[in-house]
Every structure is written in structure tokens, then in C-alpha cells.
């Protein structure tokens, strides 16, 4: 069997063989450290019972390590130029399928139904293209897919925001959106030096364990997220001002918003970043009652 893909020498050989040039627009940074890849697979808890969805396999460095341990790996690759490379580099593995499609446009549930019938669990494990990290993760969460969890490499700053706690400078609407659906934990930091080409930012691996039920029960999830988004619209403004200025018809309903805050025992002079997800749940339900 071939030597591991994820070494500097082998990666260079593969890229030279195919005359591959990186597309900045696709956020292509390939990992060249097998130890880090192994640790990612460890954090994902992949076993011979696991089906894995990978997004952006590149030349197959992570795919290869997943294929060694998983029952089945299905990878979404948007860049047509990588398809013949993947066919070559992953030829030793008969448990890998590559789908040439943008995962944001894919029917992921249908792919799961088709690919993973004989798997006990499904994980998403990926080194995500940084420019579409958040849309990809939110799509996977909002579609309520039967996933056990998501373990992905992403920009450290984004990982910090996803796992942030109230009253920290990283805490915001993304923290709440991710933690509504999952338990989020940053499991490792990754230096720039283990990629080609080197990215401009530091990276981290985050583990998102899917909750059986959302973190909080709310009457209307869409309205809950609307309230959260409004509360963080301008971080320096008070919660009351943000709600008035950013909720639909907020300015005409100042007194109702004030009443909802009082009923929820939340001081309108606080800032959105100081509220826990539980407080946002109470507030959004009360706002819904008085506004809708």
C-alpha cells in the first residue's frame, strides 16, 4: 500500500504529478501531518461501525485516515480537478465514495439514507474550507440530520466563538445557534505550519456532540433566533435598544418590549452578551406573546 498521503514529500509528489494549483477562492489548505490527522479521527471516536461524511477531502489526506478505521466514508468535493487525484490516492480503499457536489446544495439526508444503511452511527469529520465553515455547520444542524456528532477543523477564531460562554468577548449569536443544537468543545489547536499552503490564520478542531433535544425548549425556534440576532446586532448597545432597533416593528412596540423584559426578570440595560441561552429562551417566549 502507498505511503501516507499527508507527508510533505508525498503531498508534493501528488500535486506535481497532476500539476495541481491551489484555488484561493475555494479555501484550499491541505494538511501534511499524519499525527494531527490521527488525533482528529481519535476525537471523532470513529470505529468499524461508523459511517463518516467528509466535506472538502482535498487530495485525500484525512479521508485515508478515516477509511482505515471507519466502516464507510462519503466525501463531498466541489473541485472537479481533485476527482482524478482522489481516485488515484484513495484507490487502496474500497469503503470510500466521493460525490462531486457542493455540500450546501446537497440533500445530505438522502445521501445518508443511501450510503450508511449498514452503519450504527454517522459522524461528520472534515478539514472545512474556512470561507464556508459557518454556513456548512448551520446547514447540518438546522436540517436535524441523524448525526452523532461533528468534528471539524476550522479557523480558531470561529471555533472560539462556537464554544464561547456568556460574558466573553467571543460569545454571540453563533455561540447560541451552535449550542442550541450541540455541546461544543474545542479539542485541539493546530499551528499554521502543518498546512500547504500555510493559511493566514490559526486553526482549531471543535467537537460538536448533537443533543437529543435542543438545549432549551422554546415556543418558536425561528423567533428565538431572531431575538438572539437582534440582541447582538450592535454589541455596545443595551439589550433594550438592540431589540427596539432590530426586531420587526420594534420601534412601535417599545412599551411591549419593556414589559417583556420586566416579565422575564431581565434588565434591559444589560448587553446581549451577558444573557445565557436559558435567559434568551424565557425572553423570546415572552416577546412572542406580547408582539405576535
UniProtKB/Swiss-Prot annotation:
Signal peptide per UniProt: none
Catalytic activity, EC: 2.1.1.182
Reaction catalyzed: adenosine(1518)/adenosine(1519) in 16S rRNA + 4 S-adenosyl-L-methionine = N(6)-dimethyladenosine(1518)/N(6)-dimethyladenosine(1519) in 16S rRNA + 4 S-adenosyl-L-homocysteine + 4 H(+)
GO MF entries: 16S rRNA (adenine(1518)-N(6)/adenine(1519)-N(6))-dimethyltransferase activity; RNA binding
SUPFAM superfamilies named among the record's database cross-references: S-adenosyl-L-methionine-dependent methyltransferases (SSF53335)
Keywords carried by this UniProt record: Cytoplasm, Methyltransferase, RNA-binding, rRNA processing, S-adenosyl-L-methionine, Transferase
Transmembrane regions: none
One Pfam family, short name: RrnaAD
Keyword S-adenosyl-L-methionine recorded: yes
Subcellular localization: Cytoplasm
GO cellular component terms listed in the entry, alphabetical order: cytosol
CDD domains assigned: AdoMet_MTases (cd02440)
SMART domains hit by this protein: rADc
Main location: cytoplasm
PROSITE patterns for the chain: RRNA_A_DIMETH, SAM_RNA_A_N6_MT
Key word RNA-binding present: yes
Residue sites binding S-adenosyl-L-methionine per the record: 29, 31, 56, 77, 102, 127
NCBIfam families linked: ksgA
PANTHER family according to UniProt: DIMETHYLADENOSINE TRANSFERASE (PTHR11727), DIMETHYLADENOSINE TRANSFERASE-RELATED (PTHR11727:SF7)
Reported function: Specifically dimethylates two adjacent adenosines (A1518 and A1519) in the loop of a conserved hairpin near the 3'-end of 16S rRNA in the 30S particle. May play a critical role in biogenesis of 30S subunits.
Family (UniProt): Belongs to the class I-like SAM-binding methyltransferase superfamily. rRNA adenine N(6)-methyltransferase family. RsmA subfamily.
UniProt-recorded name of the protein: Ribosomal RNA small subunit methyltransferase A
Record organism: Bacillus licheniformis (strain ATCC 14580 / DSM 13 / JCM 2505 / CCUG 7422 / NBRC 12200 / NCIMB 9375 / NCTC 10341 / NRRL NRS-1264 / Gibson 46)
